[in-house]
Amino acid sequence: QKELNKSISLFHGLEKLHEKEKIDAFAVRCWPEMFTEYGCASCGPMAMMNEKKISAACEADVLGSLSCNILNQLNNKPALLVDIVDVDERDNTTVFWHCGLAPLSMAEKNSPSATVHSNRRKPLLHNFALKAGKITIFRVSKSENKLKFIVMKGKVLKRKNSFSGTSGVVSLGPNTFKKINNLFLSGLEHHVCFTYGDVFEDVKSLGKQLRIPTYTI
């Protein structure tokens, strides 16, 4: 109960920072200190902030948080930072996952539950399969030390949760394996963001307006 209370207090702390300092995007150093020094997981609190469309990215990923914030502004729907953790060439799919910071509105019906971190065994995390639907995938990247936008379309398929936490099986259309391989070869950071819906052209327009090179996959 003590660890759970600490996790909930993180949510209230982030809320207060948002209200007091007018902060719309957070990059949280979620490990190891959150576990070893404070004693809880920050995934659940960040998920609740993401639900409010206040970007909360884990692993202190500043550009990841900015990426989510841009999607929030363009789409007025929650965005989520994920790892690309698996690619199945035969199935033409990849898996998007993170420990448990997806907002509940992204959950497949009747699938959400609360859980503890798979490694650290501390609360609070969300646990569910991502709901099926079309998505826009985006990253503000500095790969090769050059600022750029990466944007692509995808679709979350109706599949079971692949891992503990929050995950979804995603198709990027034809040649998903090749597209993911090209991303990795380009040196893209290991996080991408997505939101449900199609803001592909909006991202391209923003890149043009800001004069930031925009690459479509």
Region spans (language model):
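Flexible, glycine/charged-enriched surface loops at secondary-structure junctions
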Residues: 3, 22, 29, 77-85, ...
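Short acidic, glycine/serine/threonine-rich loops at helix termini
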Residues: 36-42, 92-95
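Acidic catalytic cores of enzymes that act on phosphate-bearing nucleotides/polynucleotides
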Residues: 40-53
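C-terminal catalytic subdomain
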Residues: 53-164
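Extended hydrophobic packing segments that form well-structured cores
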Residues: 121-217
